């Protein structure tokens, strides 16, 4: 099974981590589109174009069987069009884990950390409207501009990152939030900082494990055998620090810079 995974940067490697725990026989091709990061500050039209170009690259260069959009923002902007354009390709998107958050919260106060684009996206708004209509909960939504850049630059432990998180999380701490949805695949990389600032153990909802389970189920349904070697090739569209990659995924089979052809679809 050949699987293409992409994100605007390194955050999607948290999804690859989850895949590696349950998927055995798969060749994973990961594209970090660092040239255009962060997606959360781009227009939906731009994000759709990036997503179409990367998908075409995966199909032309690596003949993938499965595409995983390891980015909430790109899922919102592109998954519908990609499924229409490539009906034979298995496509798995990433959505904020509102449903599991509703199942796990005790205080009925839920925080959502996400990029600005995800919070205003139609897919997220529809999900919130449907699920919150069934449950009496209070959502504390917080856009986190600049956090992806801090993570990409290896500044997770910096004072600036701490101050940013402190400002965003203070209202949640004061309002007895016990569950926080990590609405961007980069954010699990600062999970320990979130718990430190919240000053208590939290339910932190990340969808990587759900994506891995979905892929395993689809693989079995399509007759792919879950055995053999798990291989990972990481590619980037711009310069990136491999030391940061190794902090997330210590072992991988290859790394290279690539140029994704820009096409007008």
UniProtKB/Swiss-Prot annotation:
Q: Catalyzes what?
A: L-glutamate = D-glutamate
Under PANTHER family, the record lists: GLUTAMATE RACEMASE
Task: Report the active site residues.
Answer: 71 (proton donor/acceptor), 184 (proton donor/acceptor)
Which cysteines does the record link by disulfide bonds?
none
Q: Which organism is it from?
A: Sulfurovum sp. (strain NBC37-1)
Q: What is its EC number?
A: 5.1.1.3
Which superkingdom heads the taxonomic lineage of this protein's source?
Answer: Bacteria
What pathway does the UniProt record associate with this protein?
Cell wall biogenesis; peptidoglycan biosynthesis
InterPro entries attached to this UniProt entry: Asp/Glu/hydantoin_racemase, Asp/Glu_race, Asp/Glu_racemase_AS_1, Asp/Glu_racemase_AS_2, Glu_race
Q: What is this protein called?
A: Glutamate racemase
* Function, as annotated: Provides the (R)-glutamate required for cell wall biosynthesis.
Q: Which GO terms describe its molecular function?
A: glutamate racemase activity
Q: Lineage of this protein's species?
A: Bacteria, Pseudomonadati, Campylobacterota, Epsilonproteobacteria, Campylobacterales
Stored Pfam families:
Asp_Glu_race (PF01177)
Q: Which residues bind substrate?
A: 7-8, 39-40, 72-73, 185-186
What family is this?
Belongs to the aspartate/glutamate racemases family.
UniProt keyword terms in alphabetical order: Cell shape, Cell wall biogenesis/degradation, Isomerase, Peptidoglycan synthesis
Which EC class does it fall in? isomerase
GO process terms (BP)? cell wall organization; peptidoglycan biosynthetic process; regulation of cell shape
């Amino acid at each position: 099974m050949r699987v293409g995974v992409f994100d605007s940067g390194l955050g999607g490697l948290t999804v690859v981590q989850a895949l590696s725990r349950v998927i055995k026989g798969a060749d994973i091709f990961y594209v970090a589109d660092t040239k255009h990061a962060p997606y959360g500050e781009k227009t939906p039209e731009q994000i759709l174009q990036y997503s179409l170009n990367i998908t075409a690259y995966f199909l032309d260069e690596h003949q993938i069987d499965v595409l995983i959009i390891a980015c909430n923002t790109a899922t919102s902007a592109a998954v519908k069009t990609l499924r229409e354009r490539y009906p034979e390709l298995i496509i798995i998107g990433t959505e904020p884990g509102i449903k599991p958050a509703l199942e796990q919260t005790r205080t009925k106060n839920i925080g959502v950390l996400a990029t600005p684009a995800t919070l205003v996206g139609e897919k997220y708004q529809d999900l919130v409207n449907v699920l919150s209509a069934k449950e009496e909960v209070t959502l504390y939504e917080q856009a986190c501009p600049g956090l992806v850049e801090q993570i990409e630059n290896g500044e997770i432990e910096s004072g600036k990152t701490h101050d940013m998180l402190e400002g965003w999380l203070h209202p949640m701490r004061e309002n007895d939030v016990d569950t926080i949805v990590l609405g961007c695949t980069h954010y699990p990389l600062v999970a320990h900082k979130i718990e430190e600032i919240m000053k208590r153990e939290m339910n932190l909802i990340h969808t990587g494990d759900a994506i891995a389970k979905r892929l395993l189920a689809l693989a079995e349904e399509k007759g792919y055998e879950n055995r053999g070697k798990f291989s990972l090739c990481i590619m980037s569209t711009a310069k990136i620090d491999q030391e940061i990659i190794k902090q997330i995924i210590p072992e991988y089979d290859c790394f290279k810079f690539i140029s994704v052809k820009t096409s007008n679809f």
